[in-house]
Amino acid sequence: MPREIITLQCGQCGNQIGVEFWKQLCNEHNIDQEGILKNNNFLNEDRKDIFFYQADDEHFIPGALLFDLEPRVINSIQTSEYRNLYNPENMFISKEGGGAGNNWGCGYSQGHKVEEEIIDMIDREVDNSDNLEGFILSHSIAGGTGSGMGSYLLELLNDNYSKKMIQTFSVFPLLTNESSDVVVQPYNSILTLKRLILSTDSVVVIDNTSLNRIFVERLKLNNPTFQQTNTIISNVMSASTTTLRYPGSMNNDMISLISSLIINPKCHFLITSYTPITIDKHISNVQKTTVLDVMKRLLHTKNIMVSAPVRRGMYISILNIIRGETDPTQVHKGLQRIRDRKLVNFIKWNPASIQVTLAKQSPHVVSQHKVCGLMMANHTSISTLFERCVTQFDRLYKRRAFLENYKKESMFSSADGQGNFEEMESSKEITQNLIDEYKSAERDDYFTNTYI
């Protein structure tokens, strides 16, 4: 019996990533823009019903819910070549249409106002499932809708479907001192982090800073388009679900995939690495791919999609999903070579092993490389990303800068007009606790002190 997964796309970034993700899934499952299966030659080779369901006329419909507070992105989907793929009832655009103005509080409160409509949409999609396993949310934590409304969606899912898995693909903003996507992004980020910490089972962190570096260093592209950036993210999303859609002997469902990476539920933020990267006609500087080569490249800091000092921290767990022309003996040799060269620094309180799953390639997509791979890993250096979020938050908050628009929302209003920002302070404290948890995980006695 299939274990279905419902995807939620929230805000401009989340919906643009979702568009590329569904294009990728359609290609891999031989489904055209109308949802029609192109041929039945490989009908039993895959599990389309994890992400798609069939209408009465047997065309395939994505199990996707699209949310936005301004109409531009969803309107563009409705006029694109994929306009007939999605269920129009599964698209929510705010009637006000003004967006959230890059204000987490506005996005959150607008989500609360339309809670009944949102729940109806989710419940209807859940009722279409025979054996729902969980949800995947794509969003950004920087703006107003993806962060604020995205946070509200996570709380709703956690409250109403607490026994189902919740995973997110969360895009973190540029966190350099010189540049930022949105001036109030430190507030939005810290408020969203609280929900990612408390209301999810797994968060795949995608860092815009590292993506920009990968484009420049690997693809020689100084000014990538949004579509090119979103294609990389959708490739990661697609690769992470390969073993669910093309099942093999391991990690055939969401819970086994996540539980293999997350030993302590508190530390559930994952980093990724993908190789070789191909965008349009731009191919990363990789001439030959073997299992060993791909496994080594996945560990290379330049391929990791989070700006964190991976060499200084420690791996808690690693899962490699390898696709293409592979065999188990090559994997064994690759693991032995990595072990002999001491390329990985694991924490001491958990078995120091790289888990490897060999996944099937879609027969419908011609790959430019013989072997490709995705690494999903739990690594203590992710805490430095959260530290930068806290530092940027403190820099703004100590000056009480740019808080006027937040005061207009009930969560942050007060009778004296000065504003009530306990929610921000609480979010910072919870984020700091997560930072401390990851740092503690580097100690040899962490497991003993935590669980005994």
From Swiss-Prot:
Q: Which organism is it from?
A: Plasmodium falciparum (isolate NF54)
What is the recorded function of this protein according to its Swiss-Prot or TrEMBL entry? Tubulin is the major constituent of microtubules. The gamma chain is found at microtubule organizing centers (MTOC) such as the spindle poles or the centrosome, suggesting that it is involved in the minus-end nucleation of microtubule assembly.
Q: Which GO terms describe its molecular function?
A: GTP binding
Q: Which cysteines are joined by disulfide bonds?
A: none
Instruction: Please tell me one Gene Ontology term that the record gives under cellular component.
Output: centrosome
Instruction: One Pfam family, please name it.
Output: Tubulin_C
**Top-level taxon of origin:** Eukaryota
Q: What is this protein called?
A: Tubulin gamma chain
Q: Its GO biological process terms?
A: cytoplasmic microtubule organization; microtubule nucleation
SMART domains xref list: Tubulin, Tubulin_C
Organism classification? Eukaryota, Sar, Alveolata, Apicomplexa, Aconoidasida
Gene behind the chain: G-TUB
Matching InterPro entries, A to Z? Gamma_tubulin (IPR002454), Tub_FtsZ_C (IPR008280), Tubulin (IPR000217), Tubulin/FtsZ-like_C (IPR037103), Tubulin/FtsZ_2-layer-sand-dom (IPR018316), Tubulin/FtsZ_GTPase_sf (IPR036525), Tubulin_C (IPR023123), Tubulin_CS (IPR017975)
Which residues does the annotation say bind GTP? A142, G143, G144, T145, G146, S147, G148
Localization per record: Cytoplasm, Cytoskeleton, Microtubule organizing center, Centrosome
Question: What family is it from?
Answer: Belongs to the tubulin family.
Keyword terms: Cytoplasm, Cytoskeleton, GTP-binding, Microtubule, Nucleotide-binding
